[in-house]
């Protein structure tokens, strides 16, 4: 067992070392997060621990129905969880304060961006941001690429999935 101390809490979380913990973060309706979770489950199976974090309960509920192990909603859940996971996956807007029509707070964006977790970002956003060097791909193609990246990260981490 390994102890992980979070930056935002004096509590210590005890978990098994050999399990990769993924945090899927989404807001609004949770559709991108749900699609990611379905893709991860189809490719990597049930042994993977997927935490669904939503900026609201609707997004979290939709991701839970897609196959997440556990879920949490709102700023505090996102801030606390982001420092206890190995990988964070979501749309690029999870790094932008006030994104998702204001649902993603500055504290959420700071927690995600400062987390030691590897971040896999889907280049979809409704914000007025354009990313150079990114071609427009449909969501299913982007999900496949993200799942492949998670598979590579799991192999690099040499953890059980």
What would you call each of these model-derived segments?
Residues 2-17:
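A short, basic/flexible loop-to-alpha-helix module at the beginning of a structural domain
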Residues 15, 20-55:
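Glycine-rich phosphate/diphosphate-binding loop of Rossmann-like nucleotide-binding domains
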Residues 27-30, 55-58, 76, 93-94, ...:
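Short, ordered loop/turn segments at secondary-structure junctions
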Residues 48-73, 130-132:
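N-terminal beta-loop-helix "entrance" segment that forms/cooperates
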Residues 51, 72, 89, 118-122:
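Hydrophobic/aromatic beta-strand patches that form the interior of the parallel beta-sheet core
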Residues 70-108:
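Glycine-rich phosphate-binding loop
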Residues 121-161:
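Short, glycine-/small-residue-rich phosphate/pyrophosphate-handling segment
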């Amino acid at each position: 067992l390994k102890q992980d101390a979070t930056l935002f809490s004096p509590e210590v979380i005890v978990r098994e070392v050999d399990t990769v913990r993924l945090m899927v973060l989404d807001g609004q309706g949770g559709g991108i997060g749900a699609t990611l979770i379905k893709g991860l489950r189809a490719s990597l199976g049930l042994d993977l621990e997927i935490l669904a974090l939503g900026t609201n309960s609707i997004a979290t509920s939709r991701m839970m129905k897609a196959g997440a192990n556990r879920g949490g909603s709102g700023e505090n859940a996102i801030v606390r969880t982001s420092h206890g996971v190995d990988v964070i996956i979501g749309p690029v807007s999870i790094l932008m304060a006030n994104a998702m029509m204001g649902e993603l707070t500055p504290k959420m964006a700071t927690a995600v961006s400062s987390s030691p977790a590897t971040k896999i970002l889907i280049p979809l956003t409704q914000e007025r941001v354009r990313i150079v060097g990114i071609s427009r791909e449909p969501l299913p193609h982007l999900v496949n690429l993200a799942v492949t990246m998670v598979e590579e990260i799991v192999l690099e981490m040499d953890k059980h999935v």
